[in-house]
Curated annotation (Swiss-Prot):
Stored Gene3D superfamilies: 2.60.40.2310, 3.50.30.30, Peptidase S8 propeptide/proteinase inhibitor I9, Peptidase S8/S53 domain
EC number: 3.4.21.-
Localization annotation: Secreted, Extracellular space, Apoplast
Peptidase S8 domain: residues covered: 114-591
Inhibitor I9 domain segment(s): 28-109
Family membership: Belongs to the peptidase S8 family.
Designated name of the protein: Subtilisin-like protease
Main location per the UniProt record: secreted
Database matches in InterPro entries: PA_dom_sf, PA_domain, Peptidase_S8/S53_dom, Peptidase_S8/S53_dom_sf, Peptidase_S8_Asp-AS, Peptidase_S8_subtilisin-rel, Peptidases_S8_3, S8pro/Inhibitor_I9
CDD domains: PA_subtilisin_like, Peptidases_S8_3
Domain of life per record: Eukaryota
A molecular function GO annotation: serine-type endopeptidase activity
UniProt source species: Petunia hybrida (Petunia)
EC primary class: hydrolase
Length: 734
């Protein structure tokens, strides 16, 4: 139960020391040093000796292997070592020393979603992209479950010749042509890369699981489970346990993945916002894009509050979470005849249809309101339906366990106001339904209106076709971007609510079956959807850069739900740019976007100079000596979106697009009206006569009249006979 609640929705970044570290006084530091000469850099043994030379004189030669836990080659010039504070001070005096930072511990942040995203077998984009055949997706996670049917290598090609990875399973577990690499990077653990938590198995199968018939949870959501890129290869790098994910281990895994030859990196984990030179995911991701490796990462699960994002660097695709159109419906039926639809994956056929006494202990006890462990013991809930509030730092499944332990017959889980109307189909331990905020308030009002409230739960099973999808989940972290306000984040949203995918064990306590699946939610689930889609795009367009692929995903994103109305948030209000980014991913459109915005490595360096970072700190990120002789502001980066702070003076920004659509084509600009801002684009028409031809345009922003909102949003779109290329705009008015 604990594993499910930890990984279904990740919580805040945590910092802690292990027991061993406390007892020895040593802590893990990530040490950055100057680059040695090329000869030393090219020889692994010489590089190790160079790193060892930075250790304090008090560290004897025999201690070195136990002190240095990771040596970095691609993502950083430096190493991770166990050191005391005094030893770090001694190292700071050495020539070539740059910095030493304490490791941070980060948190982990489909039978139907391929079809929901327009992917169908033997036709369309899936067929055109060859299902991602030959692309290698590297995932940094809790490990993987070899032998699960989702990781069968039926119809899989052999790994590409470039692959240099390792398989470190023990016993009878092995790699195959689907799982082509699996390694453990949790320092000091000595465990194989098998998955004890479930999170890594779930994300890996979401990204690239093979076709598995009759996948379901408790008989619900039944269908063929398959990942986004079913013919892509998987490489798992185990960096997380139930204690979290050390960024020193993450950096080591990124280092290895780059050397192994992955094509896509998928990171369903993150922490707080930091300057990029303190953010080891940003540092490792930059090393990856230097090699043409795409990096996709989850936005975080701290929504709907603003500025709660993780993974904000512009060279990372930052992914928020959306709903899809399938629900596993469980309806709360009240004694007054009112009914309120909710969700639950556990739907027992033998639950009686009779109404039972209904109670809400939270009226008099806050702990009991959240149904924390033991909080119901002083209440008479035996044989009753118990209302529990969502939140209170108590996992949803823990709440149902509390009700069961106290003798309750069923649970109605009610959202708080901040949660809005989004619900989850969890595998509860007793009959239950999860209802939205409005329904929860009506149910509590009914309880207060009568001395004998009663309720039951009517289980309706799996229903597909909810037209209000996609919508933004309440937990999905929101912008604005704190680390770089001039870059819109998240970049994109994708399915992350009630995602069915592979699981190491049966959640139904069944034995003798390997068809083990679970339904969980989080931006951790959205990220591998996008990682798999990126694998499809890499297969279809092997010459596209990471920035070009990101541009294609963003500029082709959907703005509407299945009803043709604007995408909504958890309050059923139109979602803003800080919730959706560019919009909801549309894989088929992304494969043929018409125009792309590309970015070169030098552009990123000028952008980092424009952030005002010290040259030494930029060098840590980009792994080369930097002289900031020229710089650009954030809004001048050739990004597929705009985020500006606009005062009284007009601001002008240029963008350059590359034609990847019809060779001969003409695009005309359309400007969505933005309150308080006049937007002018010149030229208003772009004409192309050949493929890969480039064109540059300028956008002018000017305040116009009074404004009531500090943040306003809009968009510019370039339209031809075949394409619409859209860039969202955020303006902060001052």
């Amino acid at each position: 139960m604990t594993c499910i609640c930890i990984f279904s929705i990740a919580f805040l970044l945590s910092f802690h020391l292990t027991t061993a570290q406390r007892s020895t006084g040593l802590q893990t530091y990530i040490v950055h040093v100057d680059k040695p000469d090329a000869q030393v850099l090219a020889n692994s043994a010489d590089l190790e000796s160079y790193y060892n030379s930075f250790l304090p004189a008090t560290v004897s030669g025999s201690e070195v292997p136990s002190r240095i836990i990771h040596s970095y080659h691609h993502v950083a010039t430096g190493f991770a070592a166990k050191l005391s504070g005094e030893e770090v001070k001694e190292m700071e005096k050495k020539a070539g020393f740059v910095s030493a930072k304490l490791e941070k511990v980060l948190t982990l942040h489909t039978t139907h979603t391929p079809n929901f995203l327009g992917l169908y077998q033997n036709m369309g984009f899936w067929q055109e992209s060859n299902y991602g055949k030959g692309v290698i997706i590297g995932l940094l996670d809790t490990g993987i479950t070899p032998g699960h049917p989702s990781f069968s290598d039926v119809n899989m090609p052999s790994p590409p010749a470039k692959w240099k990875g390792k398989c470190e399973f023990t016993g009878n577990a092995t790699c195959n042509k689907k799982i082509i690499g699996a390694r453990n990077f949790i320092s000091g653990s000595g465990v194989p890369p098998t998955d004890e938590e479930g999170h890594g198995t779930h994300t890996a199968s979401t990204a690239a699981g093979n076709f598995v018939n009759d996948a379901n949870v408790f008989g619900n959501a039944n269908g063929t489970a398959v990942g986004m890129a079913p013919l892509a290869h998987i490489a798992m790098y185990k960096v997380c346990s139930e204690d979290g994910c050390s960024d020193a281990d993450i950096l080591a895994a990124l280092d290895a993945a780059i050397d192994d030859g992955v094509d896509v990196l998928s990171l369903s984990l993150g922490g707080y916002s930091d300057p990029f030179y303190y953010d080891n995911i940003a540092i490792g991701a930059f090393a990856a894009i230097r090699k043409g490796i795409f990096v996709s990462a989850s936005a975080g699960n701290d929504g709907p509050l603003n500025s709660t994002l993780s993974n904000e660097a512009p060279w990372i695709l930052t992914v928020g979470a959306s709903t899809h159109d399938r629900k596993i419906v469980a309806t709360a039926v009240l004694g007054n005849g009112q009914q309120y639809d909710g969700e639950s994956a556990f739907q027992p056929a033998d639950f009686p249809h009779t109404l039972l006494p209904l109670v809400y202990p939270g009226t008099s006890d806050e702990e009991a309101a959240f149904c924390s462990s033991g909080s119901l013991d002083k209440f008479d809930v035996k044989g009753k339906v118990v209302v529990c509030d969502r939140g209170g730092d108590v996992a949803r499944l823990e709440k149902s366990q509390t009700v069961k332990d106290a003798g309750g017959a069923a649970m109605i889980l009610a959202n708080l106001e901040i949660d809005g109307e989004g619900t989850f189909a969890d595998a509860h331990v007793l009959p239950a339904t999860h209802v939205g905020y409005a329904a929860g308030e009506m149910i509590k009002s009914y309880i207060n209106s009568t001395s004998t409230p009663t309720a039951g739960i009517l289980f309706k099973g799996t229903i597909i076709g909810f037209k209000s999808s996609p919508s933004v989940s309440s937990f999905s972290s929101r912008g604005p971007n704190l680390a770089s306000p001039g870059i819109v984040k998240p970049d994109i949203i994708g399915p992350g609510v009630n995602i069915l995918a592979a699981w190491p064990v049966s959640v139904e306590n069944k034995t003798g079956t390997d068809l083990t699946f679970n339904i969980i939610s989080g931006t951790s689930m959205s990220c591998p959807h996008l990682s798999g889609i990126v694998a499809l795009l890499k297969s279809a367009h092997p010459d596209w850069s990471p920035a070009a692929i990101k541009s294609a995903i963003m500029t082709s994103a959907d703005q509407s739900n299945l009803e043709g109305q604007p995408i909504l948030d958890e309050r059923n209000l139109p979602a803003d740019i800080f919730a959706t980014g560019a919009g909801h991913v549309n894989p088929s459109k992304a494969s043929d976007p018409g125009l792309i915005y590309d970015i070169q490595l030098e552009d990123y360096i000028q952008y980092l100079c424009g952030l005002g970072y010290r040259e030494k700190d930029i060098g840590l990120i980009v792994q080369e000596t930097v002289k900031c002789e020229s710089s650009i502001s954030e809004a001048e980066l050739n990004y597929p979106s705009f985020s500006i702070i606009l005062g009284p003076k007009t601001q002008n920004y240029t963008r350059t697009v590359t034609n990847v659509g019809d060779a001969s084509s003409t695009y005309t600009v359309n400007i969505a009206k933005t309150q308080g801002v006049d937007i002018v684009v010149e030229p208003a028409t772009l004409v192309f006569t050949k493929m890969y031809q480039q064109a540059t345009y300028t956008v002018s922003f000017t305040q116009s009249g009074d404004f009531t909102d500090r943040f306003v949003q809009g968009a510019i779109s370039w339209s031809s006979n075949e394409y619409v290329v859209r860039s969202p705009i955020s303006v902060k008015l001052e």
